[in-house]
């Protein structure tokens, strides 16, 4: 900290020509803060200076505070030192302004027309079945062809683009390479060949999630850094998203990024046969820990389209710094048409698909997400055999329901003299004691996030544990999230409530061949 030596070294470095020069400086951590800080390894543990430390700093810097004033931890006000402020500003002007400085240019794109998202509004036709991953790829193509955002859509894939069914985009939009195609790909004779181009729009990053996430950050912050807004979609094997690069996603949030993270091949049982390394049932839970991320688990194509439409509107029209994480799956099933007036419920996180049929007999409420919704629909039919009627609900985001719950709780806590507000969950479900079964292809902790705002008799089924290599049917039976498990959970609640006799449950368990024993070699 010898300023004469410091300036002499810098002057020599500037004067040296012909090769790079490094000035190596040995400094003392906490220098200038007094003997209690300087050179002590406790600097980060010191959160507050005592009076003797303040006196040292005052005397060392020539400040005019009295000992009595120091007891109140006074600030040095800029107005009291105009000559120093003027000097500091002049130095910053020489360095092209203050750093860091965030410039927020006007958004230079518009939102696509509603028809861009409408392909699946009428559902699938005939015997056609699609997965939500397939629906996403078709929606992505529609966005890339739209006049509003087409050239600004940035698809980023670190691996498995063909697994996700994205190979049709290779020839149509090209894979970006700064020098174009430098080799003949092994699939050059097929229609959907691997096509690299200087003008390509897709980013294929190889098996490099850190690099792909960095590309996502660059694209997701380009509206601020370059005044050119893009709409990035980072598509990855869901297990290798938050589990592998959560710190980079936190960094993206810190940089106020905007874009979509698509956790493809999601689900502990839906991605079957790939064991504990790949079968993901916890990324949604991890996504909910990031304050800048909205996390979604759509069951149907129209839900997916509604969520993406809402996300683009948030980023472009509402000018929000937000990241949307969407779980999509590889299980094919018929997609129903979009019901009327469900957009609000989809975005809030919960809506009714169908009420209980008229008639006699007890009623249960079944809540599904993702492709496990098909197991819910299977349970509806099984329950009818035992005289039980079912309401069917779709939970698109337990995270959004929880955000709403916490916000309402805070308002009620701070306004005890006013009529208490209700959460969206409470508004939808009321205070009925009707048994509720919520089932997910993720850990039970995901639907459990909203237990506080649920009515009584709320039961959750999830896929806690390691993934296992087997068929979907076997996995769902093992994790107890199949139609049979949902049926038995509903009957069990009805027995507890006194609506049916225990013999009805026993009859169902016998019919489905259920054993209460479970062999899990991974249990601790």
Predicted ranges, named:
Residues 1-336, 343-344, 399, ...:
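Thiamine diphosphate
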């Amino acid at each position: 900290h010898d300023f004469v030596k410091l300036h002499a070294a810098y002057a020599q470095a500037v004067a040296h020509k012909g090769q790079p020069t490094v000035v190596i400086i040995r400094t003392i951590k906490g220098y200038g803060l007094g003997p209690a800080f300087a050179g002590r390894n406790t600097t980060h543990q010191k959160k507050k200076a005592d009076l003797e430390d303040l006196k040292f700093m005052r005397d060392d810097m020539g400040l005019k505070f009295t000992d009595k004033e120091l007891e109140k931890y006074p600030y040095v006000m800029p107005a009291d030192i105009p000559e120093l402020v003027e000097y500091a500003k002049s130095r910053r002007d020489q360095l092209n302004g203050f750093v860091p400085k965030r410039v927020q240019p006007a958004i230079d794109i518009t939102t696509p027309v509603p028809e861009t998202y409408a392909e699946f509004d009428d559902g699938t036709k005939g015997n056609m079945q699609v997965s939500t991953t397939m629906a996403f790829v078709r929606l992505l193509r529609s966005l890339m062809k739209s006049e509003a955002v087409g050239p600004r859509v940035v698809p980023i894939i670190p691996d498995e683009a063909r697994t996700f069914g994205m190979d049709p985009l290779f020839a149509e939009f090209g894979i970006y390479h700064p020098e174009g195609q430098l080799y003949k790909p092994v699939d050059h004779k097929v229609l959907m060949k691997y096509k690299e181009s200087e003008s390509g729009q897709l980013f294929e990053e190889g098996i490099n999630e850190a690099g792909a996430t960095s590309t996502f950050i660059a694209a997701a912050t380009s509206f601020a850094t370059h005044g050119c807004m893009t709409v990035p979609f980072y598509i990855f094997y869901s297990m290798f998203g938050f589990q592998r690069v959560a710190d980079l996603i936190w960094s993206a949030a810190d940089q106020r990024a905007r874009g979509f993270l698509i956790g493809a091949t999601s689900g502990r049982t839906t991605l079957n046969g790939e064991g504990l390394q790949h079968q993901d049932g916890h990324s949604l839970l991890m996504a909910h820990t990031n304050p800048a991320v909205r996390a979604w688990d759509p069951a149907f194509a129209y839900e997916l389209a509604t969520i993406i439409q809402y996300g683009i509107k948030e980023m472009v029209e509402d000018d929000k710094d937000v990241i949307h994480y969407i779980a999509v799956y590889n299980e094919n099933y018929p997609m129903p048409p979009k019901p009327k007036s469900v957009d609000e419920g989809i975005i809030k996180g919960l809506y009714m698909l169908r009420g209980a049929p008229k008639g006699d007999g007890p009623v249960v409420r079944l809540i599904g997400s993702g492709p496990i919704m098909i197991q819910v629909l299977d349970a509806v039919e099984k329950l009818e055999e035992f005289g039980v009627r079912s309401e069917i609900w779709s939970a698109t985001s337990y995270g959004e329901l929880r955000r709403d719950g916490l916000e309402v709780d805070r308002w009620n806590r701070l306004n005890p003299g006013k009529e208490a507000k209700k959460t969206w969950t409470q508004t939808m479900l009321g205070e009925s004691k009707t048994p509720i079964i919520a089932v997910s292809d993720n850990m039970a902790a995901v639907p459990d996030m909203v237990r506080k705002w649920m009515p009584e008799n709320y039961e959750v089924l999830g896929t806690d544990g390691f993934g296992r290599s087997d068929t979907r049917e076997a996995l769902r039976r093992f994790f107890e999230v199949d139609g049979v498990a949902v049926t038995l959970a509903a009957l069990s609640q009805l027995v507890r409530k006194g609506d049916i006799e225990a013999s009805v449950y026993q009859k169902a368990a016998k019919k489905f061949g259920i054993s209460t024993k479970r062999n899990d070699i991974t249990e601790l």
